[in-house]
Amino acid sequence: MARILRASCLLSLLLAGFVPPGRGQEKSKTDCHGGMSGTIYEYGALTIDGEEYIPFKQYAGKYILFVNVASYUGLTDQYLELNALQEELGPFGLVILGFPCNQFGKQEPGENSEILPSLKYVRPGGGFVPNFQLFEKGDVNGEKEQKFYTFLKNSCPPTAELLGSPGRLFWEPMKIHDIRWNFEKFLVGPDGIPIMRWYHRTTVSNVKMDILSYMRRQAALGARGK
């Protein structure tokens, strides 16, 4: 009887969303802080070929999904899903931006000029070409982290309590808000303010559902205000 009651309680908690995440208390996503000063439009980055500096204010009025990517990661196949996400939600104002990084397991070892050929012929392979903008390889954590990543991380709580195995993480100093692994994601709203942050293992399909849900809520609020 006690076992049945325990199972019933756990099921109720799971359905209500109250069961704590496993493996070090991960959360599939976190909501970003309100009231942070500044916007993402104060920053920008060089494209992967180094030929153009793109100020992020170029994307004003759109939803921007920031993703730190890697070519030789167990999650590299997310590139395929990100292409599909860009194609599906692009007409609704979503822009995906990818930022190669070699700080997690040394899984982006090549030069900038080697990354696109690697994606095309190795992983995901099969002639794959990203349909979203990639930028120059750089750090997302540590002393030399790109400033816009400092802004994003300070705007949103981390998705996991633990950073991971120090032997596979290549930066110093380590901080609580640091990105945990390749393919962590941040969504920034049309006003340049961060909205959500996703754990790297959260599926792209779940990310899509979260984005669509948020877009619908904002559309409903806008309709009421008219």
Curated annotation (Swiss-Prot):
E.C. numbers: 1.11.1.9
Any Gene Ontology biological process: response to 2,3,7,8-tetrachlorodibenzodioxine
Pfam family, one: GSHPx
Tissue expression: Secreted in plasma.
CDD domains, alphabetized: GSH_Peroxidase
Signal peptide region: 1-24
Record-annotated active site: 73
One GO CC term on file: extracellular space
Reaction(s) catalysed by this chain's protein: 2 glutathione + H2O2 = glutathione disulfide + 2 H2O; tert-butyl hydroperoxide + 2 glutathione = tert-butanol + glutathione disulfide + H2O
Subcellular location: Secreted
Role: Protects cells and enzymes from oxidative damage, by catalyzing the reduction of hydrogen peroxide, lipid peroxides and organic hydroperoxide, by glutathione.
Family: Belongs to the glutathione peroxidase family.
Name of the protein this chain belongs to: Glutathione peroxidase 3
Species lineage: Eukaryota, Metazoa, Chordata, Craniata, Vertebrata
